[in-house]
Structures are given as structure tokens and as C-alpha cells.
Amino acid sequence: MSGARPEQAALSRNTDMSKTEETRAVIEAMVDGLNDHRILDIGEFFTEGFRWMGNTGCGTKEGLRQFQDNWQKPFQAAFSDKVCVDEARLYMGEWAAAFGRQDAIHSGTFMGVEPTGKKIQIRYMDFWKVKNGKIVDNWVMVDFPKVLAQLGVDVFSGHGWESYDRKEEMAPKPRKN
């Protein structure tokens, strides 16, 4: 890399490490709340103005109400019998991260796909910032292309890089600088 290197990890640099156990308690209780399919009282774990920042397809939700109306409700309408399974969690001061899956039944319309009744897995990663016992920020990556593939929709039209793994296409090589 030429030139100055960008600043790294600026958001978590000055985290208060004495808050690790408090953060753990908030996240564990919140995941239990999600598994109980709570919507109306989920504010127990989030500030009114918290930010939920998702990848394309998920969108960004500004505040608790948008999260409830534009994420939780449509998600629970599309997927029933949903169980969140964090496969790993990390805690560091006011920060927490997890990756895992939600096992669910596709029982409502999702991204234009009518209900199939299929049992699917929804993979995700979450990064949370907790202050004063509540989540203020949540960065989220949900693997919607994988969800849609399980429902018979290939968003990459056969050109996902898995085609290189299957030797169906040749992976391009970088140009030399």
C-alpha cells in the first residue's frame, strides 16, 4: 500500500474494559428476547435512538420503531419457528460481536418469494455497542443471497464465485502493477 495507512479500530480503541460483563448480560438477555419473538417490548435492550446498520437488502434502521416495523415484523412474517443460535460471541468492554445462524421455516413472502414451507438457515454476523445497559449501535451482515439460494433464487445468475470452486468458471488473475 502506498501513502498513509488509514486509521484502524477507531470506534473500539477507548472502550471501557470494566463494562465487559455488563455488555455480556445485555447481549445474552437480548438474544433470549429475540428467541422469544419479542417485538413490542424489545426496547428493554435498545435505546430509542439506536442504529441498526444492515447490509444491502436489510437496510439501515434509525431508531427502535424503524427496527420493529421495518426489520422485526417483516422478518417474523416471512420466517416462523425461528431460533437464533450464536455459534461464537466475543466481548470486549462496551463491544460485543457474534456470528451464527437462525433456523427457521419460510412461511411468509420474503424478497418477493412466496412461502415455500422450507426449513432454512439464515447466517449472520452482529457487532454491538452497549452504553448504560442498552444497545446503541448494531452493525449487521445477514447472508440474504444464501437464504434466497435455499429458496431457489440465484441472485448471482450462476456467476457467484462458487463457480470457481466448482471449476465451472476460471477465476480471473489480478493485473500486475
Name each model feature, range by range.
Residues 2-48, 156-177:
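Short, low-complexity N-terminal intrinsically disordered segments enriched in polar/charged residues
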Residues 35, 104-106, 130:
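Beta-strand elements of well-folded, non-transmembrane domains
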Residues 23-27, 35, 52, 71-75, ...:
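Short, structured motif recognition centered on aromatic/hydrophobic residues
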Residues 56, 106-120:
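A cross-kingdom feature marking solvent-exposed beta-strand/loop segments within repeated
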Residues 85-89, 123-128:
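Hydrophobic/aromatic beta-strand elements that line small-molecule binding cavities or substrate pockets
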Residues 139-148:
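Short, solvent-exposed aromatic-acidic interface loops
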Residues 40-94, 101-103:
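A solvent-exposed, acidic/Ser-Thr-rich amphipathic alpha-helical stretch
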Residues 27-30, 41-43, 50, 67, ...:
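Hydrophobic pocket/interface hotspot
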